[in-house]
Amino acid sequence: MKSSHTTLICIIMLSLFALHECEKMEVKEIGRSSKIILPACMHETCSGGFSLKNDCWCCLRLKTKQARCWKEKEFPNAKELCFANCPPLE
């Protein structure tokens, strides 16, 4: 048997084991594990053009972008400002 066949068989066996474990879970456990918790603020790219550098902190719960982002150049404590001004999750 080729090594690619062996690898494929291993992947299938692991998948079947994972599927079997999911089958044993109760509905309550699935509901709890499927919740996605987003932070109030995220480190994002605000500079124009193509940039991979995150240069500001933005609140995900405010409506307008001007009111919700703090650039690190203008505000050295942008992270603290964001978390202080962003409303908590309900």
Swiss-Prot record:
BP terms from Gene Ontology: embryonic axis specification; suspensor development
Signal peptide positions (record): 1-22
Superkingdom of origin organism: Eukaryota
Function: Maternally-contributed central cell peptide regulating suspensor development and correct auxin distribution in early developing embryos.
Keyword Transferase: no
Reported consequences of knocking out the gene: No visible phenotype, due to redundancy with ESF1.1 and ESF1.2. Simultaneous down-regulation of all 3 genes by RNAi induces embryo abnormalities.
Consequence of substituting W70A: No effect on topology, but loss of activity
Family the UniProt entry places it in: Belongs to the MEG family.
S-S pairs: C41-C58, C46-C86, C56-C82, C59-C69
Tissue: Expressed exclusively in ovule embryo sacs and in early developing endosperms.
Keywords in alphabetical order: Developmental protein, Disulfide bond, Signal
Name under which the protein is recorded: EMBRYO SURROUNDING FACTOR 1.3
InterPro entries: ESF1_brassicaceae
